[in-house]
């Protein structure tokens, strides 16, 4: 198989890989929310507890759980991903950035990554394995 044929065959997987990126990212995002809200699968440091529900971090955890669930299903993907991208930008600049410029030092690498993955998905859409795709038919 020539290089151009391999690239062409790999490129055909792009829509499905977009769905995989959305699904895996959403699952990880849900886990971030459940850790904060229910201490599952583990609580938040330093004591392994949960956050105050009526706090800014509590609101973020609700967005992670509900928004992550919608993204997992691929439902209302573009607006939800855009909102969650903004949430992660706020989380980074408000909580991580003041500690250090570098995400690897300030603990904000996941927030930066989620911010840009959700921003991309808000532009690219949910992919073929989604309720949005079913609703379009």
Task: Label each residue range with its predicted role.
Residues 1-38, 54-62, 66, 73-137:
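Extended, low-polarity transmembrane helix blocks
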